[in-house]
Amino acid sequence: MTIIFQFALISLVLVSFVLVVGVPVAYATPQSWVESKKLLWLGSGVWIALVLLVGLLNFFVV
């Protein structure tokens, strides 16, 4: 269970880093807003799912 928790936590950190860099870039380029909007929604959904997963796994690991 600890390995799954660590993998989820590392995934959350990596997705957070990608979103911190990617969101301003997506907003700064108006040409590809339609494509970027889909990726932003997908990234946000993955981030929320990972936050909930890490919270749930933290309950079982600790």
UniProtKB/Swiss-Prot annotation:
Q: Does the keyword S-adenosyl-L-methionine apply?
A: no
Which key words tag this protein in UniProt? Membrane, Photosynthesis, Photosystem II, Reaction center, Thylakoid, Transmembrane, Transmembrane helix
InterPro entries (alphabetical):
PSII_PsbZ, PSII_PsbZ_sf
Quick one: a GO biological-process term for this protein? photosynthesis
GO terms under cellular component:
photosystem II reaction center; plasma membrane-derived thylakoid membrane
Gene3D superfamilies reported for this sequence: Photosystem II PsbZ, reaction centre
User: What residue ranges are annotated as transmembrane?
Assistant: 8-28, 41-61
Which compartments does it reside in? Cellular thylakoid membrane
Membrane topology, as annotated, equals: Multi-pass membrane protein
Please name the Pfam families in this protein's record: Ycf9
What does this protein's UniProt record list under function?
A: May control the interaction of photosystem II (PSII) cores with the light-harvesting antenna, regulates electron flow through the 2 photosystem reaction centers. PSII is a light-driven water plastoquinone oxidoreductase, using light energy to abstract electrons from H(2)O, generating a proton gradient subsequently used for ATP formation.
For this protein, the record's NCBIfam families field holds: PS_II_psbZ
Q: How does it assemble?
A: PSII is composed of 1 copy each of membrane proteins PsbA, PsbB, PsbC, PsbD, PsbE, PsbF, PsbH, PsbI, PsbJ, PsbK, PsbL, PsbM, PsbT, PsbX, PsbY, PsbZ, Psb30/Ycf12, peripheral proteins PsbO, CyanoQ (PsbQ), PsbU, PsbV and a large number of cofactors. It forms dimeric complexes.
Q: Which family does it belong to?
A: Belongs to the PsbZ family.
What name does the UniProt record give this protein? Answer: Photosystem II reaction center protein Z
Q: Which organism is it from?
A: Trichormus variabilis (strain ATCC 29413 / PCC 7937) (Anabaena variabilis)
Organism phylogeny: Bacteria, Bacillati, Cyanobacteriota, Cyanophyceae, Nostocales
Give me the gene this protein comes from: psbZ
